[in-house]
Amino acid sequence: DGASIEIRSSDYYEHIITIAGNEGERFGDSLSTTSDGRQIIIGAPLAESNGISNVGKVYIYDRDVQRIQQTVTGNKTFTVEQTPQGRAEVYVNNVYQTNSTYYIGGTYTFTTKTATLATAPLLGDFVEIETNNVQLVDTIEMTNANQSAGFGSTVKICPTNCSVYAGAPTSNQEVPEGGSVTRAVNQSRLYGTITGTVATPTVTSGHKIRINNYVVEFTNTTLAQVVIDINNSNIPNVVASATADNKLTISLINVDAGEVANKLYVLPASSGATPLTDLGLDIFAVVQTITNPYPKDYTNFGHSISVSSDALTLVVGSPTGQSNLEVTLDAGKTTLDSDHTELRDISTQSGVVYTFDYLSSANDSILNPGKLVFGQQVVDTNVDKLSKFGNAVD
């Protein structure tokens, strides 16, 4: 008898969910994700903003993760509040677990909303379950919005997942189509604290938010009860309070104990972004608009963006910009007007790349953030006019 071998194969990628934008916005024209794939930044360069057409917007989405701490000795079952889309993924103390349905010797099974582990975690251990439910966290809009700016034509989140950069290459903020780049920071993640902008807010009883991926449910509508509900959730190193003018503050008890640029998450849960809006929690705050150090009409500064691996250097392409190089004579020995006059070699629309370096402030906070300052221009000395140097940077 001959043996038979059955081979099964499937696509590497499995469709889970579709994120749809508004018609006519060119939603999805640009896209970037955090290093763990849990947040998605999507540009929509033709979106209306503040009543002005075709300004552009940037949307931030989060892929739901729920963290549950082991509080009962021997417990093996952990239930999430949202039904997973596609396969749920399970981690114990940040260690990936394998599903017995798909892997021989797997470490858990999953039914509906409940993960059952083969081995019970120890007391104090935490279990994280990715449900693949994607929800809108925040919308970034352009400061000094102007028509046809193309804001969101290119987007990039830094490698430490705390800063979002959005290019507006056809912005008319300084000169016609001179372009700009906006930097917005996840303020709780970067600084370990966030304060709402709404005084004496009213929330909906039963609505939920996530703090460091722990789900917090509001049991009443008042700010005082929101503070109590958060503090009663016993989230490690997290405390909530009300300011003197009745705004919610969520912060780390010991900020220094938080991981750099990864200190505090404040995110939507099954209720969506509504409770965050009710509390005035603006997760991503715009802190700087960066423009061309050599502004010129139609240079499209911000057409391309890249961020260094340490998140301290921003690289911006201006593919229709003009090179602006100092000309030296006799290896710098000859000067003009006692070195008060410079000669410049300019090539029209040859393309330029600019670097910007991050300088932290003395007391870094959302009210006094560090800034990016111009570093240098990078050009190809052999480039010709209309070469579009800087059309892409990485």
Question: PLM features: residue spans?
Answer:
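Acidic, small/polar residue-enriched beta-strand/turn segments
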Residues: R183-T197, H207-R210, S241-F284, V327
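Extended Gly/Ser/Thr-rich low-complexity repeat segments
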Residues: Q85-V95, L122-V134, G258-G272, V327-G332, ...
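Extracellular interaction modules
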Residues: D1-A3, L117-E128, T243-T249
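A general beta-strand register signal
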Residues: Y91, R210-I211
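Extended beta-strand solenoid/passenger and fiber regions
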Residues: D64-Y102, K113, A120-N133, V185-N186, ...
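Conserved beta-strand/short-helix segments
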Residues: D1-V65, N99, L123-G124, N132-A184, ...
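Amphipathic, non-transmembrane alpha-helical segments in extracytoplasmic/periplasmic proteins
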Residues: N94, T222-P236
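Short, contiguous acidic and Ser/Thr-rich linear segments
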Residues: N213-T222
